[in-house]
Amino acid sequence: MNQEVMNLFNPQAPAQVFDSIRISLASPEKILSWSFGEIKKPETINYRTFKPERDGLFCARIFGPIKDYECLCGKYKRMKYKGVICEKCGVEVTLSRVRRERMGHIELAAPVAHIWFLKSLPSRIGTLLDMTLKDIERVLYFENYIVTEPGLTALKEHQLLSEEEYMIAVDEYGEDSFTAMIGAEAIHDLLAGMDLEKIAGDLRSELASTTSELKQKKYLKRLKVVENFMESGNRPEWMIMKVVPVIPPDLRPLVPLDGGRFATSDLNDLYRRVINRNNRLKRLIELRAPGIIVRNEKRMLQEAVDALFDNGRRGRVITGANKRPLKSLSDMLKGKQGRFRQNLLGKRVDYSGRSVIVTGPELKLHQCGLPKKMALELFKPFIYARLDAKGYSSTVKQAKKLVEKERPEVWDILDEVIREHPVLLNRAPTLHRLGIQAFEPILIEGKAIQLHPLVCTAFNADFDGDQMAVHVPLSLEAQLEARVLMMSTNNILHPASGAPIIVPSQDMVLGLYYLSIVNQNEPGEGMVFADMGELQHALETKAVTLHAKIKGRFRTVDAEGKVVSKIHDTTPGRMIIGELLPKNVNVPYETANQEMTKKNISKMIDTVYRHCGQKETVIFCDRIMALGFAHACRAGISFGKDDMLIPDSKIKLVSDTEALAKEYEQQYNDGLITQGEKYNKVVDAWAKCSEKVADEMMARIKAVEFEDNGRQKPMNSIYMMSHSGARGSPTQMRQLAGMRGLMAKPSGEIIETPIISNFKEGLTVLEYFNSTHGARKGLADTALKTANSGYLTRRLVDVAQDCIVNSVDCGTDKGLTMQPIVDAGQVVASVGQRVLGRTALDDINHPVTGDLLVKAGTLMDERDVEQIEKAGVQSVRIRSALTCEVRVGVCAVCYGRDLARGTPVNQGEAVGVIAAQSIGEPGTQLTMRTFHMGGTAQVVDSSFLEASYEGKVEIRNRNVVRNSDGQQMVMGRNMAVLILDEAGKERATHRVTYGSRIFVDDGDKVKRGQRIAEWDPYTRPILTEIEGRVAFEDLVDGISVQETADESTGITKREVIDWRSTPRGNDLKPAIVVQDAKGKVGKLSKGGDARFLLSVEAILSVEPGAQVRPGDVLARIPMESAKTKDITGGLPRVAELFEARRPKDHAIIAEIDGTIRFGRDYKNKRRIIIEPHDSTLEPVEYLIPKGKPFHLQDGDVIEKGDYILDGNPAPHDILAIKGVEALASYLVNEIQEVYRLQGVSINDKHIEVIVRQMLQKVEITTQGDSTYIPGDHVDVIELEEVNERLIEDGKKPAEGQPVLLGITKASLQTPSFISAASFQETTRVLTEAAVAGKTDMLQGLKENVIVGRLIPAGTGGTMSQIRRIATSRDELIIDERRKASGVEVAEPMLADMTTAAQ
């Protein structure tokens, strides 16, 4: 009943139900249909009465009353006159809320162009009329006339005429023989007279006939715009406005301030200018003013409307009274403070509070301590309701008083209300979903929120003054979700890697580590204990210490659940930890019977979670935390200055290195080495010294010492802290007790003089000064890093937000191949680690016995992975989000395991957002530096190869010859040495470069660490592969070759110099030729001549006439790259990969298999042609800058995908040449490498999800019978649908190839214009969408948040599914009725968000 009465007084309009939103151009009629009246005056309100002026910008007659149900003059008041229009003031009696909804309009005296369609590049008006923007502006702003109808004169259509030319033309041809116009009317008439269909037809035929690429591009661009207009039903002349809509007054309010001044929205100023100029123009036209004055006024009107829509887009910015630019309609939408990001995506919530956090070690994992005062305020509505229900108060007012007085019954009720009502805790910045979790509140005294220590890692919180916010979920559904999905006990695993995130840290680790230490010769060593009771007794009486070696009986259960006991060698401390382990057959005592470093504790928790489930894990974690704290306190581990031991050998090491540095200095002064080499050598020497000192220090701190009675001395406490993983790292210890070592300048260069002292000894003034560089740079970096990392996360979320698990299985037979990642012979990630939690694509068989290990379609868990590792499987095909064939989102089987739960992923999981968070969250830990590799600050690529395993050698693509010195030389460009174990399984693969000396052969046995090959790291050799005599060609002294004597050694070397710099040398082609016995040029095995072209700086190694054998070195080319190499690392590298940018010196990749031929060179580029083996293909040519080190010879055979020029490959090339799978593995490995360096583990599948989003588009190559144009970027899904329809109709389908888009570009090209507009470049996105009349189907998360609905993921996904089913049923019912009655039933109206300005 109450509700009905309320509804009568405050009628709620039913919310519009809609499934999609369309945006298009508004016609003048449409604008008039929205409007409630014309605004004729620029006045706003009367300064004395504060009432709105009639016909002004706030007019009550047009926009509605100011007070609810009361007209302006006060004649009609109250509800009973609802809907009456007052005859005196003309105001309708209704709710004042309509002032937020009713629009007005301004009739313009002259048409004006809409600036968005004029200036937003590419200009839509310009493209349609096929005129340049400059020309159109000349017409619009009244500089030139434009010929609209040339008649029979010599003028051309669309020709521009200046004032003079126009006059001359009128004199010459007479006024009626042609039509030329000026201003927006001219453009309007031209647009109105366009026959779009004819233009489209003409353009298509032009396209078919033209061959020039430039023209093609131009026609394509124009055709696209023309087709957009045709398809959307927009008319071109609507881009010129005759009526300007005025937004409702309450959206541009005028607020009185104290002191009789007003604060107003800038829009009012902008509208006032438009109205003033419009009225003045009307008056001038009525007065028949001279044309020049009218024109000037029209131009000013155009500028005023431009400023209203987009201030500052053209001409100077219009500023207000305080010299601040006025905020136009476009500015209202744009940027972080615009409507989209400020109000639609970021809303403030009520029922929240924030306070400082303190630690609450006695809490359970699912609890948090909430200050009473805070709880009382947050739960007020619930308390009022309970007070009412219990009869303590009858009105809200009474309840309020009771609460304010804080009566005892209020506290009792607060306890009741809070019971089992979870609250959400959030710590900013919320970088991933674990930044908001639900807890059950426990009321506490004081004013600080208590937080459970174990969840600190997830929140990245510490107790040095951090604050957290509390939010109260109000509705029952919200409470349910908080409890079931967000409770801290449900978030045990990290969504990024699947590793436990509820892991003890710091003090707790220290306590557990202390408990698990084993010491020699402790009291009670060798005792045997039957159970924990005995042990406790012995510990109390000090008969045994925590660290003594003892035997103890430990009880656990077997597979049937029966108790079994076994005696273990252990210590009392470890028995205490073991006692806490859940009793389970898969959690053996060994899990606790080891040194409790942070890593081992994490593994232990992981084991417990996998085998015992969530509840047991939570209880176990709580107990282990309490144990850790207790023993950290009892251990009394402290940090003293004397714990830092400086190694005695430091002085000697430092003096040795100083002597070395002096020697290098001397060598430099004698001219034996260059300054760069000296710098590198000195830096190298100091780096080695610093390493050695650190090693000595660690050895000394680690050393086990004994007292006189033979008992082991307590362990060094600093070592304990560092080794256990509680706090500190070896690098920090090195700075405290070793030597600080080398420092970098802000530019990234390393300062030659190191800091020899450590912090214990204290730094000298100079050393201190040098060390401040690095510290200052570190702070500056940190600030930049945070912003950059946040921006990366935002782009990632934006590109991946609509990737949701939508179906169970797409049934694809595509997938990725997973192999171990090997870095410098070390396996960094094994196959097992990579396939855990993924679905097998094919059956996985044992490589030796052929037994089936895992069936295809199995989600591989720890047990399967263990089998795969045991069997030594080296490559596994798995399903991946990248190759999933679901139309929208991904399917559960391709995605695999939900890492945060350890179970198959649920439908409706927003995997895109989780992927974005997992990659973005560790962003702040990555470095910002680009590493400058000065010379050999680190030794240039190693110069030898050692076997990383024992085994048998197998050589792939073997091409080895024995040279004159009897050494085996590698002649193959892609030769690889494999090391196999006994079972013949491949353990390691090493590429061996051309020109290396190799020491092993097929079938040899090698030991670990044995040399396999070596090469000169600083030069690349040119080898001969035939026997013969050497002859020189075009090697002319002083022009193309010169002898230089080394000053220090006096040895001369002959070096090729740049021969093109002299006029005589222009046509030379310096080369070394190997001749056969008859003195003719020898032939190579592949058929080319034995002529070896030399590049600049090549050093000759042979004399003319010398006899050579295969494998001998003819010349050496110094490697440029050894000098300096910038390595982009850290965050910039990740961003570069996700943005799919071409690296600066990118590699050139061969597109086809073929033979290399050298073409005619250009001035500073080399032309290289690949002649394909397959005669049906065309040869491909590449241009390579001459200075680049280039190692291929004429006649070399090259395979598709080989590098012609070394460097970082551009991802686009990999996609085009090697395909999607190669691209995926490249991106995944490169991105993982950056994170691995920082010790961050992220699962591959997250990167795959993002890459999937980057590959959503296809570039049309052949159009078939579709309406697409070659070069169009189309969604994969859309192309498939169109092709299906074409094939059904028996037509030719369109073809396309996948394109890789960077994440920013991909976000802007999403099918949803709302999502794109709220990301970046709002104006451009909306302009494009309006011209094309785009419809947003509201599929992603972002669009739904913006229009204020539940997101179609998680629990909201079910709702949207139900809504979809309901809609389809409605349509069925309507159809049925239609058929039954034979009458057309009106379609339910879709909400039409046709916007004019936006």
UniProtKB/Swiss-Prot annotation:
A Gene Ontology molecular function term of the record: DNA-directed RNA polymerase activity
Catalytic activity: RNA(n) + a ribonucleoside 5'-triphosphate = RNA(n+1) + diphosphate
EC number, as in UniProt: 2.7.7.6
GO BP term (any one): DNA-templated transcription
Highest taxon, organism lineage: Bacteria
Function, in words: DNA-dependent RNA polymerase catalyzes the transcription of DNA into RNA using the four ribonucleoside triphosphates as substrates.
Protein name, UniProt field: DNA-directed RNA polymerase subunit beta'
Species annotation: Mesorhizobium japonicum (strain LMG 29417 / CECT 9101 / MAFF 303099) (Mesorhizobium loti (strain MAFF 303099))
Gene name linked to the record: rpoC
